[in-house]
Amino acid sequence: MSGQNQKTDKRIAWPIIIMNFTGVYDYEAFARNNKFIWLDCRHLYGTEGYCDRDGTLALKRMIADYPAEGVHFIDSGNYHYLTKFWTDKLETPFSLIVFDHHPDMQPPLFDNILSCGSWVKDILDHNNNCKKVIIVGASDKLIQAVPKGYERQVRFYSETTLMHEEGCCLLYTSPSPRDRSLSR
């Protein structure tokens, strides 16, 4: 076979990184893959729900040698703010898609302390590469509480928008990507 006819596999194997704060992944069969990178965060202080200065420094040191690209399992919702540290490493424009019941766009309760409730707002306020945020599944009540001024950057698909009557949603009925037919 000539070199011109050979296809080169251009897939890149991005790392799968598990950030273990609570031990929750100890009970998950999928996490036992020896190719996954485990970061043991159980010894860190100042990281649960809120991330203080020491916690921020420790976490940034911990992820410094890993690329932002990849899949990052970041424990419970108390640690979603870690997404900010990963996106801070991106050097090209990006859109952030968040699947959560909460928009995580509250002003910080304490002066400049990142929290599980403020990290999306912090990314929008400080990361010039973040061009758009799409939040899927947030409650209508919490969306109404989002501070004004983010309408051009944030798109919400609320839990109400996503609700549907049984039997009226679109389903893919064929597993083949070439022959996907939609049924109602």
Give a label for each model feature.
Residues 19, 99, 178, 184:
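Active-site flanking residues adjacent to catalytic metal/cofactor-binding acidic residues
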Residues 112-122, 141-142, 156-171:
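Active-site glycine-rich loop that binds ribose-phosphate moieties when present
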Residues 42-69, 76:
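Active-site-flanking structural segment that lines cofactor/substrate pockets
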Residues 74-141:
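Active-site histidine-anchored catalytic micro-motif
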Residues 172-179:
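Conserved small/polar residues in nucleotide/adenosyl-binding loops
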